[in-house]
C-alpha cells in the first residue's frame, strides 16, 4: 500500500470520529466511516483497519451501556449471524471492491424501504422470529464484507421498539462479539497486517474522544429524534455505497 497523503489522513481522522459517535450515540452513522475509509484506502484493506477501530469503540460502548442490554434478542441472533459471516468471508475473497459496495448499498436501501413502509402503516408489531433470523444473517454478511452491519441491525432493533439506551447497549454487545469473531477472517485474507495496525494506532485517540462525546449526546437526545437520525444516517450511508 502506498504512503498516505494529507487528504487521506484527514478522511481517516473523520472516519475515526464517526466510529466513536456511532458506537455510543448514533447507530447507522458507521456506514459513513466505511465510505471515508474506503476513499482513503483500498476498499478491501480499509475493512481491516476500520475493524480494529470498531473494536476499540465497542469496548467503550460495552462499558458505558453494560446495564441496558436485551439478552433475549442477542441469543436469537447468534446462529444466523455466524452463518452470514461465513458466507460473507467467501464473498469478500471473491468479489471486487465495487461489487461489495453495491451489494451492501442495495441491501440497506431495500431494508430501509421496508422499515419506512411499516412505520407509515402504523404497524406496532415487532419483527417475528423468522424476521430476526433474516436480519441476523444479513447483519453477519454485511458486517463481514464491508463493516456495514450497523444499519441492518439498527433497522431490526428499531422494529423491536427499544428505548435509546437499551438499543445502544444491545447493539454494543452484539457488535463487540461479532467484530472480535471477524478478526481471524481478516488476518486469513491477508488484510490485517503491521502496516495497517500502525495506521490504526494513530487514529485510536480520536475514537476515544468521540465515544465520550457520544455518551454525553445519547443522554440528551429524545427518542423520536434518535429514531429519525438512525433512519436518515442509514439512507445516507446506503446511497454513498451505491455511488
Predicted regions and their residues:
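Cytoplasmic-side transmembrane-helix entry/capping segments in multi-pass membrane proteins
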Residues: 71-81, 103-107, 126-136, 166-173, ...
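Small-residue-mediated transmembrane helix hinge/kink sites in multi-pass secondary transporters
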Residues: 35, 89-93, 155, 215-216
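Small-residue-rich hydrophobic segments that form or flank transmembrane alpha-helices
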Residues: 8-75, 136, 140, 150-211
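Membrane-interface helix termini and inter-helical loops of multi-pass transporters
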Residues: 1-3, 90-99, 186-198
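Residues within membrane-spanning alpha-helices of integral membrane proteins
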Residues: 9, 48-51, 105-108, 112, ...
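Transmembrane helix exit motif
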Residues: 58-68, 89, 103-128, 215-216, ...
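Hydrophobic alpha-helical transmembrane segments in multi-pass integral membrane proteins
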Residues: 46, 88-93, 101, 141-148, ...
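Interfacial loop-to-transmembrane junctions
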Residues: 212-233
Amino acid at each position: 500500500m502506498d504512503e498516505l497523503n494529507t487528504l487521506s489522513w484527514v478522511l481517516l481522522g473523520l472516519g475515526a470520529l464517526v466510529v466513536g459517535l456511532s458506537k455510543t450515540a448514533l447507530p447507522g452513522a458507521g456506514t459513513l466511516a466505511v465510505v471515508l475509509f474506503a476513499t482513503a484506502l483500498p476498499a478491501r484493506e480499509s475493512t481491516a483497519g476500520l475493524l480494529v477501530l470498531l473494536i476499540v469503540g465497542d469496548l467503550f460502548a460495552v462499558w458505558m451501556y453494560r446495564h441496558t442490554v436485551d439478552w433475549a434478542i442477542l441469543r436469537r441472533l447468534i446462529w444466523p449471524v455466524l452463518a452470514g459471516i461465513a458466507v460473507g468471508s467467501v464473498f469478500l475473497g471473491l468479489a471486487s471492491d465495487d461489487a461489495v459496495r453495491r451489494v451492501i448499498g442495495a441491501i440497506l436501501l431495500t431494508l430501509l424501504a421496508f422499515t419506512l413502509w411499516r412505520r407509515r402503516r402504523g404497524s406496532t408489531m415487532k419483527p417475528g422470529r423468522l424476521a430476526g433470523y433474516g436480519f441476523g444473517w444479513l447483519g453477519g454478511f454485511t458486517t463481514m464484507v464491508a463493516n456495514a452491519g450497523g444499519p441492518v441491525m439498527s433497522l431490526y432493533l428499531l422494529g423491536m421498539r427499544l428505548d435509546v439506551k437499551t438499543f445502544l447497549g444491545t447493539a454494543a454487545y452484539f457488535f463487540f462479539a461479532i467484530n472480535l469473531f471477524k478478526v481471524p477472517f481478516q488476518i486469513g485474507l491477508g488484510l490485517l497486517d503491521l502496516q495497517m495496525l500502525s495506521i490504526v494506532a494513530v487514529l485510536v485517540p480520536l475514537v476515544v474522544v468521540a465515544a465520550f462525546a457520544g455518551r454525553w449526546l445519547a443522554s440528551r437526545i429524545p427518542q423520536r429524534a434518535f429514531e429519525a437520525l438512525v433512519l436518515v444516517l442509514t439512507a445516507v450511508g446506503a446511497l454513498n455505497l451505491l455511488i
